[in-house]
Regions:
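Specificity-determining recognition surfaces
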Residues: 1-12, 256-285
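A short beta-sheet element
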Residues: 1-9, 172-173, 189-255, 276
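Non-catalytic DNA-recognition/assembly elements of restriction-modification systems
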Residues: 11, 19, 23, 42-45, ...
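Hydrophobic alpha-helical bundles that form the membrane domains of multi-pass transporters
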Residues: 18-19, 29-33
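Feature representing long, continuous alpha-helical segments
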Residues: 23, 27, 142, 206, ...
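Extended, domain-scale alpha-helical bundle/helix-rich regions
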Residues: 45, 50-51, 55-128
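Low-complexity, Lys/Gly-biased intrinsically disordered segments
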Residues: 95-104, 127-129, 140-182, 196-200, ...
Length: 311
């Protein structure tokens, strides 16, 4: 083991200042040590702020977007209420044709006497306490299920894996990547054609659908299906299909701070975090006119790109 010999140590020359100067030197070193310690604390705080700032800024941009503060309103836009009327008419047509089922909990949200009310069947309920923020005059509040033709998942029996050349792609929440895309190729699962046919009757993803994670650590992630591709997602996710609404707007809305907070409060706390389908369908959506939805998404993506944020 390496060591310094006694003879070497005893022969060292040591500069020796007067006693009073020794005291002044020690006091100075103690003061510098204190300053270094204070600097270290300040540095750690700065590092914490720097690491938290990008996420906080991203949330702030999203919140501005869904509150109607990201782009100016255009008086020539068709009001959101007119869009809702067209959505209701389209849903009735699809119900008549047997393509979708009638909503069990269809509701209409409206304003009266400076308050917000929700009409559920013949019952009217004041929902002022549920409204999280003010929105522009030509926007409206609506439940997510009332602007979608599908919010659903597959049966909860997990199908067995098969070789890729024998099956159909079967994704899960882990395939909703942090860069805002969906993983279709790396370490993915495949299921038999028979299982696919059986499970796809409830929720078969299509282009412009949104895959929304509702179970586990990835809870609250929303990803847009940007291509026509045959695949299923496990019950860890649900398929959200907007109707006559700009899908990217709903995708970003589902990742807004307001929805994230709601999902955290609403999830089941026993075992693995699990957000029930009923809670997702009841999400309150601040709905802008269709053209403004497009402008919001365009500006949102410009800002996120400038800040080098991936969603």
């Amino acid at each position: 083991m390496p060591r310094v010999g006694t003879e070497t140590m005893t022969s060292l020359l040591v500069p020796m200042p007067p006693l009073e100067e020794q005291r002044r030197i020690v006091e100075k070193i103690d003061g510098v040590a204190s300053a270094i310690s204070a600097y270290d604390v300040a540095y750690q705080k700065t590092e914490t702020l720097n690491s938290a700032f990008p996420e906080a800024l991203k949330k702030s941009i999203l919140q501005e977007a869904v509150q109607g503060k990201l782009v100016p309103q255009d008086p020539s836009d068709e009001p959101a209420e007119a869009l809702l009327e067209r959505i209701r008419a389209e849903k009735q047509r699809l119900i008549k044709e047997g393509k979708i089922k009638k909503d069990k909990h269809e509701s209409i949200i409206f304003r009266r006497d400076n308050s917000h009310y929700e009409k559920r069947g013949s019952e009217e309920v004041c929902i002022d306490e549920d409204i999280p923020f003010d929105i522009p005059e030509n926007w409206t509040w609506i439940r997510l299920q009332n602007i979608c033709s599908l919010i659903g998942d597959i049966d909860h029996n997990m199908p067995k894996s098969v070789p890729a050349d024998e099956g159909v792609l079967f994704l899960s929440a882990k395939d909703l990547l942090d860069d805002g895309t969906i993983n279709y190729t790396q370490n993915v699962k495949y299921i038999s054609r028979a299982d696919f046919e059986r499970l796809s009757r409830k929720a078969l993803p299509q282009k412009n659908d949104i895959i929304y994670s509702r179970i586990g650590a990835a809870l609250g992630k929303a990803r847009l299906v940007e291509m026509s591709k045959e695949f299923l997602v496990s019950y860890s996710c649900c398929v959200v299909r907007p109707l006559l609404v700009y899908p990217p707007y709903i995708r970003y809305y589902l990742e807004s701070p307001q929805i994230l907070l709601h999902s955290i409060k609403a999830r089941q706390s026993i075992g693995v975090p699990d957000l029930g389908m009923g809670e997702i369908k009841k999400y309150l959506v601040a709905l802008p006119p269709y053209n403004e939805q497009i402008r919001i998404v365009k500006q949102l993506e410009v800002l996120l790109d400038r800040c080098n944020f991936k969603m």
